[in-house]
A protein has these predicted regions:
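Loop/turn elements at beta-strand to alpha-helix junctions within RNA-recognition modules
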Residues: 108-111, 295-297, 647-648
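Conserved helicase motor core of SF1/SF2 NTP-dependent helicases
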Residues: 441-458, 462-753
Length: 753
């Protein structure tokens, strides 16, 4: 924990500047003390390296420029801020399309300021920075470059994740004074089981019994939609074995480990669809499902993917994506209320008022509706439900909002009633929601009192720390917890000081190795994983072969027979690779380009390689202009490209170059660090290893596995021969990169330039 807090201190000391535009005051949230403003902030290209807040982070902002009023100069610093969902992200049409990609902040600016004479006076200082395009509808605004301001971020070094993880552990281990305050018996048995996977005491649960449609989805009486049934029938043997294993789940815990391209998330989605989309007899509500991923973007992707599946199936499922329940619970301050309330009291009564009023205010400032193809957040869903039912079910709340809109001040009792009405609204919305996608940290604590899922999926479970895994086990008692992931690709992130980093103030963490071992990895280590998915349906052109041999004991196999691995588009790229390879035969669509005159260049603590950079961009633009380069999934579309590299400086350089390309090319191109590439794929992948004197950190098996399993049709690796060796050791060879080099050399697929 020290290292994570230290990094936040480093970010604070660095005082990195971010471009922002001051849009409009949020009039319905003005109090006697603060006037909230909506900011739109341009995210940096490398979010991780820059320390850019998410909706669950705690921070303040400083404006770089000062404001002069009445002969005095004022500094707008240490101003509390919250990242909120961008109100224009989900709008179908906006005038300035850049806005949809920006982050939105609610910034609570003080109304009272001290002048040079020591007097407290009311000033609206932030209006000095407000953009000139002051449309009543936010979707009509346009951001002028010369009107941008600069801000810096001051992080709260305390971690909400750390608190949530330890609270979950204490929930299991501390003696409870009240019997109903602790975990259920089923949760306790699951907790004991993950301490010893082969313990003798096990209760077995049968999901096929709980959901009869699982036993035979094709029976007409279950009325499973064709779109879901068609996908179910396409299950391979591995998928079917995992599906049948749901008949005997030990203590409700089920682990499914899957290789790249094996359809892990798809398997989850089809199972969820079978449970929720079949015909329901004598049931008004569908069986609720909680879908957890510990990465916010993956949360959004999962919600969108399930929504698309249900849309295709013609079934109306109420789906919500949720970021940041802990902030809503602990940090949405009781507006105009007493601050003397104990932590226990504020914990017991979640206060949604602040978020709801933000959403309400912003909704009234946009004339276009939310894009129906984008899953709403919890706050958006609550506002939309209120709008549909305000005259019937929420008349009291409507009267209070009308009172606020008229400019009339609310009394203390009014604010209490407002919080009560909003809390009831959120309870109603959560009670009628069928599917919630969120992070484990957002699901911690009192959320379990509002939403009681029958099934919990934890996708990318091998990426979650063991303490994170405890959160769904501690607070929920579903029929089953289903964990899916790939222990060969990902592991939890734990910041630890390597030798080269000790000067930066980071400390050696003696528990780092233990913290990097996920619950799923431990289960795999003792052969306690229930099912394995080892059929790769992503890779064509024999791209599956090498990672299978290196990382999966040659058990990962292609989902296609030999005749089907080279459809026309893949065969076209084989010819392209052969042209790079001096017209030598290429037996699989992977080559290494060894640029002997290239050199790495260091920028701060990161690297890039200018010669690699130029060559990759030249080849990428060549392919993007080639009509023969087609998408594998849709031959009518041009193929896609991923440029992956281990180093943030190299990513920044590629991003800058790609931004100058035509918009149509940019839409077909991704630039990612290798660590961010997990879960992404492209038709052609350029993997720029950058380094020329050492293997760097690419000799890590999980990182390398991710790197060489992203391509669907072809993979081009820029790598120097020196990366196959360990510097300073005579004849010493890197463990994994040497295998990559030797295999490619053996098959005559190394191109030396």
């Amino acid at each position: 924990m020290y290292n994570e807090e230290h990094l936040h201190r480093v970010f604070n000391e660095r005082r990195q500047e971010f471009r922002c535009w001051v849009i409009t005051p949020l009039s319905n949230l003005i109090t006697a003390f603060t006037k909230p403003w909506l900011f739109l902030v341009q995210p940096p290209e490398n979010l991780e390296a820059s320390g850019f807040p998410t909706t669950t982070d705690r921070f303040k902002i400083d404006m770089v420029s000062n404001v002069k009023r009445g002969g005095d100069e004022y500094s707008l610093v240490h101003i509390p801020a919250t990242r909120i969902p961008n109100p224009l992200e989900t709008c179908e049409a906006v005038r300035d399309t850049r806005i949809k990609t920006f982050a939105a902040y609610k910034v609570d600016v003080p109304r009272s300021w001290t002048n040079s004479e020591g007097d407290h006076i009311e000033l609206d200082l932030m209006s000095e920075f407000q953009i000139s395009c002051r449309e009543s509808d936010l979707d009509k605004i346009f951001l002028e470059e010369h009107e941008h301001q600069l801000l810096t971020i001051e992080w709260d070094v305390n971690s909400a994740t750390f608190e949530a993880e330890l609270d979950a552990l204490h929930f299991f281990t501390e003696e409870k004074r009240l019997q109903n305050r602790g975990p259920t018996l089923k949760s306790q048995r699951a907790f004991r089981m993950i301490q010893n996977f082969h313990s003798s005491w096990k209760d077995f649960y049968d999901l096929h019994k709980d959901f009869p449609q699982l036993s035979n989805p094709e029976l007409r009486r279950h009325a499973v939609p064709d779109a879901i049934l068609r996908r179910f029938k396409a299950f391979n043997n591995d998928h079917s074995n995992a599906f049948n294993g749901l008949k005997q789940i030990p203590n409700g815990l089920y682990f499914v480990n899957g290789c790249p391209g094996s359809g892990k998330t798809e398997w989850n989605m089809i199972l969820a669809g079978l449970i929720q989309c079949s015909k329901r007899r004598h049931k008004k509500k569908r069986n609720p499902i909680l879908f957890l991923v510990d990465i916010n973007k993956a949360v959004d992707d999962a919600a969108s993917r399930y929504y698309s599946l249900c849309q295709e199936a013609g079934v109306k499922i109420r789906i919500v994506r949720m970021h940041g329940w802990p902030l809503e619970m602990r940090q949405s301050a009781k507006l105009h209320g007493s601050r003397s309330t104990t932590n226990q009291d504020s914990f017991a009564v979640p206060d949604f008022t602040n978020r709801f009023l933000v959403t309400a205010g912003l909704s009234k400032q946009t004339s276009v509706s939310r894009d129906p193809g984008i899953v709403p957040t919890l706050d958006q869903a609550s506002w939309e439900y209120f709008e549909k039912n305000k005259r019937d079910a929420f008349l009291g709340l409507q009267k209070l909002l009308d009172k606020m809109e008229s400019g009339e001040a609310l009394s203390t009792d009014d604010w209490k009633h407002l919080r009560s009405h909003v809390s009831r609204l959120y309870r109603v919305v959560l009670a009628r929601t069928d599917f919630i996608a969120t992070t484990p940290v957002a699901a911690y604590g009192r959320f379990s009192k509002f939403f009681k899922p029958d099934i919990i999926f934890m996708d990318e479970a091998s990426h979650a720390r063991e303490l994170t895994t405890l959160i769904p086990l501690a607070y929920f008692t579903p029929k089953a917890w289903i964990f899916t992931g790939d222990v060969k690709q990902t592991q939890p992130f734990v910041k630890d000081a390597k030798d080269r980093e000790k000067h930066s103030g980071l400390r050696f963490n003696p528990f780092a190795a233990q913290l990097r071992m996920s619950t799923m990895a431990r289960a795999d280590h003792v052969n306690a994983v229930n099912s394995k998915l080892l059929v790769n349906k992503r890779a064509f052109g024999n791209l599956h072969r090498l990672p299978s041999a290196m990382f999966y004991e040659s058990q990962m196999r292609s989902g296609y027979d030999e005749a089907s691995r080279y459809p026309d588009g893949v065969a076209y790229l084989t010819i392209y690779l052969q042209s790079l390879n001096g017209n030598r035969h290429v037996d699989e669509n992977r080559i290494i380009v060894n640029m002997e005159n290239s050199n790495e260049e260091k920028h701060r603590d990161s690297y890039w390689n200018p010669l690699h950079h130029q060559w990759v961009l030249a080849q990428a633009t060549h392919l993007l202009q080639d009509d023969g380069f087609r998408g594998l999934r849709d031959r009518e579309m041009g193929g896609t490209i991923m440029i992956a590299t281990p180093y943030s400086t190299a990513v920044k350089q590629y991003h800058a170059a790609v931004k100058s390309w035509p918009e149509s090319w940019q839409r077909r191109t991704q630039v990612l660090t290798v660590d961010k590439a997990q879960g992404n794929e492209a038709d052609v992948v350029f993997l720029d290893m950058v380094r020329t004197t050492t293997a760097g950190f690419m000799d890590d098996p999980k990182r390398l596995n991710v790197a060489i399993t992203r391509a669907r049709q072809a993979e081009i690796i820029l790598m120097r021969r020196t990366m196959a060796y360990v510097p300073g050791k005579k004849f010493g060879r890197s463990k994994y990169l040497s295998q990559l080099w030797d295999d490619t050399l053996l098959h005559k697929r190394i191109v030396t330039i």
